[in-house]
C-alpha cells in the first residue's frame, strides 16, 4: 500500500478525531504517546523528539522536538529505541520466525534485531565478517551523516559506502510529480527519509533521484540552498563511490544563487548590495567554487555582480522599482537559479533532462528573446504601404485619463461577491510581484507544511499571532494593516489606498468608527489629501490595483491616484 500524501500540521483538534480502525495485517511499529524517538528530517539528519499523538490510520505521529516545535512525521521516518524482551523479534517484520539462511542478527549499537533478509543490504550471519559485531543501516547513517557532507574516512565511512550501494525502498515504485521534483511516498536519498529538492539536495543524472547533502561523501564544500550546478551520479548507479563535477557558473547565476540562499536563510525579499550581498559573496568566495570566475580580482567582483543584477530585469527587482533605495535587490520569483545543460568536452552526453521545475532543462532567463512581430503592410496596386507594428494598429490606446477612469468605474460597479468562508482572507496586490514574504502570508489559522524542516528555511513564526512580517512596503502597510499605519509616510510614496464598502446581501451592515485609513482619505481633510470624489472631479488619473472582500461583506479597492507608478 502506498504511503499517504504529506500531511500538514493544524491547530484544530479535528486532525485527531477518531479514525477508522487500522488494518490488522502487516507489520506495525510499536509507537505510543510519550515515547522518545529519533525522527529523520528533510535534511537527512536525525533529531530527538517525543511522540504526542499516534494516528494509526494515516501512519503518522505528532512529534514534539527539543525546541518545543511539533510536526507530523511518517512512521517510516521514526526510529524508536529497542525494548527489553524484544531481542528475538525482528524490528521490520515483527516476527520471531527463524529459518536456515535467514537468522536473526542484533545491532551492536541500538540492540534492534533484524532478519538477514529484512535488512538492506542483507545482514551477515552471526560470526561472519571481519568482526563479531555488526551495526545496522540506521546506526551507520546516524553516525556518518553530517551537515556539509558525510564522513569520508574511518570505519563508519567505509560501512556507509557499502550500505549506499542499495536503497531501502523500491525506486521504480515511487510516484513522482511532472517535474520529477517530489514523490508521494516522501522517500529520497540513501536514507529513505523526506526531502525538499531545492534545499541542499543533489539529483542523480542517471536515476533522477534526489540525495541529501548530509548523506553524500563526494562534496568538497557545503551546498548553498538551491545550488544545482553539479553533475552528480549516485553510488547505486555507479556501483561504487559517488561522482560529482561542478558546472561553470556565470555572474547572473552567482547573483541569483546568493540572493536565493539569503532569502531562504533570512526570510527577506530585499537585500542591501553593499551590506549583505557583496559581503556574503566575498566571505564565501572559495566555497562557491566558481571555476573560471574565481580568478576575478576583488576590485572587479562588485561591478560584475552589480551589472548582473541591473541587466537581468526578468530575474531581479531593484529597490528603485518599488520606491526604495536603489541598492536593494530581490528575486522576482523565489525559485533557485535555472541550470543549463552541460556543454563542452567535459560534459556527459547521457545527461538527461529534468533539471528545471517543468521537467525539461531550464535555460537562463537572461538569454530569452521573443521574436519581434513583423510590421503590417497594406498592399495596393504598384506599392506597399507600411502601417507599423501590429500593436500600434490593433491596439490604439485611449488617453490615459479616460482609460483609468473607465477602469475605476467598472470596478466600482462590479457585483459584490459572497463573503469568503475563511475569516482570514489574504490580500493579493497587483498581478506581477507580491511584496509580502511567503512566511508572512501564513496566518494564525492556516496550516503549515508537514516537513517544515529545521534548517533556516523552515519556521513556525508564520503561525504565531504576535509575529508580523519583517518588512512591508508602504503600500502594503496602508491597505493590508490599517491598524499599524506609520505616523509619517515616506515622501517617495505616490500611491494611496481608498476603501469603498458595499454591504453584502443578507448581512447587516456593521456600524464602526472609521479607521485611520478611511479618515485620511475622506473628502475635505487637510494636508492636501483628497477623497475619491475630489480626484475624479479634478480629472486626475486613477488606477485600480486590487480588490478584496472583507469578512463582513464589504468590498475594498486599492486605488492609485495622481498617475504615479510603483510597478
From Swiss-Prot:
Would I find Metal-binding among this entry's keywords? yes
Q: Where is the composition biased (Basic and acidic residues)?
A: 371-386
**Complexes and interactors:** Interacts with CHMP1. Associated component of the PRC2 complex. Interacts with p53/TP53.
Q: What is this protein called?
A: PHD finger protein 1
Gly residues composition bias: which ranges? 524-534
Q: Which GO terms describe its cellular component?
A: centrosome; cytosol; ESC/E(Z) complex; nucleoplasm; nucleus; site of double-strand break
Low complexity biased stretches = 423-433, 456-470, 488-510
Q: What results from changing residue 47 to A?
A: Abolishes histone H3K36me3-binding
Which is one Pfam family of this protein?
PHD
Q: SUPFAM superfamilies, alphabetically?
A: FYVE/PHD zinc finger, Tudor/PWWP/MBT
User: What InterPro entries does its record include?
Assistant: KDM4-like_Tudor (IPR040477), Mtf2_C_dom (IPR025894), PHF1_PDH-finger1 (IPR031202), PHF1_PHD-finger2 (IPR047010), Tudor (IPR002999), Tudor_PHF1 (IPR047399), Zinc_finger_PHD-type_CS (IPR019786), Znf_FYVE_PHD (IPR011011)
Domain Tudor, chain residue ranges per copy: 29-86
Q: Which disease is it linked to?
A: A chromosomal aberration involving PHF1 may be a cause of endometrial stromal tumors. Translocation t(6;7)(p21;p22) with JAZF1. Translocation t(1;6)(p34;p21) with MEAF6.
What sections of the sequence does the record tag as coiled-coil?
none
As for family, the record states: Belongs to the Polycomblike family.
| Residues modified as Phosphoserine | 420
Q: Which PANTHER family does the record associate with it?
A: PHD FINGER PROTEIN 1, POLYCOMB-LIKE TRANSCRIPTION FACTOR
- Any idea which UniProt keywords this protein has? Chromatin regulator, Chromosomal rearrangement, Cytoplasm, Cytoskeleton, DNA damage, Metal-binding, Nucleus, Phosphoprotein, Repeat, Repressor, Transcription, Transcription regulation, Zinc, Zinc-finger
Q: In which tissues is it expressed?
A: Highest levels in heart, skeletal muscle, and pancreas, lower levels in brain, placenta, lung, liver and kidney.
Spell out the subcellular localization from the entry. Nucleus; Cytoplasm, Cytoskeleton, Microtubule organizing center, Centrosome
Question: One GO molecular-function annotation for this sequence?
Answer: histone methyltransferase binding
Which effect does the record note for changing residue 71 to A?
Answer: Abolishes histone H3K36me3-binding
| Function recorded in the entry | Polycomb group (PcG) that specifically binds histone H3 trimethylated at 'Lys-36' (H3K36me3) and recruits the PRC2 complex. Involved in DNA damage response and is recruited at double-strand breaks (DSBs). Acts by binding to H3K36me3, a mark for transcriptional activation, and recruiting the PRC2 complex: it is however unclear whether recruitment of the PRC2 complex to H3K36me3 leads to enhance or inhibit H3K27me3 methylation mediated by the PRC2 complex.
Please give the annotated consequence of changing residue 41 to A.
Answer: Abolishes histone H3K36me3-binding and localization at double-strand breaks (DSBs)
Alphabetized SMART domains for the sequence: PHD, TUDOR
Amino acid at each position: 500500500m502506498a504511503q499517504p500524501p504529506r500531511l500538514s500540521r493544524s491547530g484544530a483538534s479535528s486532525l485527531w478525531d477518531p479514525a477508522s480502525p487500522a488494518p490488522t495485517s502487516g507489520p506495525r511499529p510499536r509507537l505510543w504517546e510519550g515515547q522518545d524517538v529519533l525522527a529523520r528530517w528533510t535534511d537527512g539528519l536525525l533529531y530527538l523528539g517525543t511522540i504526542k499523538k499516534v494516528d494509526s490510520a494515516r501512519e503518522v505521529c505528532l512529534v514534539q522536538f527539543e525546541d518545543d516545535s511539533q510536526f507530523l512525521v511518517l512512521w517510516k521516518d521514526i526510529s524508536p529505541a529497542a525494548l527489553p524482551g524484544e531481542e528475538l523479534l525482528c524490528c521490520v517484520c515483527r516476527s520471531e520466525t527463524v529459518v536456515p539462511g535467514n537468522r536473526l542478527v542484533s545491532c551492536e549499537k541500538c540492540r534492534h534485531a533484524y532478519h538477514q533478509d529484512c535488512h538492506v543490504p542483507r545482514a551477515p550471519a552471526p560470526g561472519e565478517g571481519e568482526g563479531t559485531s555488526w551495526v545496522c543501516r540506521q546506526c551507520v547513517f546516524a553516525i556518518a551523516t553530517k551537515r556539509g557532507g558525510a564522513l569520508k574516512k574511518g570505519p563508519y565511512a567505509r560501512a556507509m559506502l557499502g550500505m549506499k550501494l542499495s536503497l531501502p525502498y523500491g525506486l521504480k515504485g515511487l510516484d513522482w510529480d511532472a517535474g520529477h521534483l517530489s514523490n508521494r511516498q516522501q522517500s529520497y536519498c540513501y536514507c529513505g527519509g523526506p526531502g525538499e529538492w531545492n534545499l541542499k539536495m543533489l539529483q542523480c543524472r542517471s536515476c533522477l533521484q534526489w540525495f541529501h547533502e548530509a548523506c553524500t561523501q563526494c562534496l568538497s564544500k557545503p551546498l548553498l540552498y538551491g545550488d544545482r550546478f553539479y553533475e552528480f551520479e549516485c553510488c547505486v548507479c555507479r556501483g561504487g563511490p559517488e561522482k560529482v563535477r561542478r558546472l561553470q557558473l556565470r555572474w547572473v547565476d552567482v547573483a541569483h544563487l546568493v540572493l536565493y540562499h539569503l532569502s531562504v536563510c533570512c526570510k527577506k525579499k530585499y537585500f542591501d548590495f553593499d551590506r549583505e550581498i557583496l559581503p556574503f559573496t566575498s566571505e564565501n568566495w572559495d566555497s562557491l567554487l566558481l571555476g573560471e570566475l574565481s580568478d576575478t580580482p576583488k576590485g572587479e567582483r562588485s561591478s560584475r555582480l552589480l551589472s548582473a543584477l541591473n541587466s537581468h530585469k526578468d530575474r531581479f527587482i531593484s529597490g528603485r522599482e518599488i520606491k526604495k533605495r536603489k541598492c536593494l535587490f530581490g528575486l522576482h520569483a523565489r525559485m533557485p537559479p535555472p541550470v543549463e545543460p552541460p556543454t563542452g568536452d567535459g560534459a556527459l552526453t547521457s545527461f538527461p533532462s529534468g533539471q528545471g521545475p517543468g521537467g525539461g532543462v531550464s535555460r537562463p532567463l537572461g538569454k530569452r528573446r521573443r521574436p519581434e512581430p513583423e510590421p503590417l503592410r497594406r498592399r495596393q496596386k504598384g506599392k506597399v504601404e507600411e502601417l507599423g507594428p501590429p500593436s500600434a494598429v490593433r491596439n490604439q490606446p485611449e488617453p490615459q485619463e479616460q482609460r483609468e477612469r473607465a477602469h475605476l468605474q467598472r470596478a466600482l460597479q462590479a457585483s459584490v461577491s459572497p463573503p469568503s468562508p475563511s475569516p482570514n482572507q489574504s490580500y493579493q496586490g497587483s498581478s506581477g510581484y507580491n511584496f509580502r514574504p511567503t512566511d508572512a502570508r501564513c496566518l494564525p489559522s492556516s496550516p503549515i507544511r508537514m516537513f517544515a524542516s529545521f534548517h533556516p528555511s523552515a519556521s513556525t513564526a508564520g503561525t504565531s499571532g504576535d509575529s508580523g512580517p519583517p518588512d512591508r512596503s508602504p503600500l502594503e502597510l496602508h491597505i493590508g494593516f490599517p491598524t499599524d499605519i506609520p505616523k509619517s509616510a515616506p515622501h517617495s510614496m505616490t500611491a494611496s489606498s481608498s476603501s469603498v464598502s458595499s454591504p453584502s446581501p443578507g448581512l447587516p451592515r456593521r456600524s464602526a468608527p472609521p479607521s485611520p485609513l478611511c479618515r485620511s482619505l475622506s473628502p475635505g481633510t487637510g494636508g492636501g489629501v483628497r477623497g475619491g470624489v475630489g480626484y475624479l472631479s479634478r480629472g486626475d488619473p486613477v488606477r485600480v490595483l486590487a480588490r478584496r472582500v472583507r469578512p463582513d461583506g464589504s468590498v475594498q479597492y486599492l486605488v492609485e491616484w495622481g498617475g504615479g507608478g510603483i510597478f
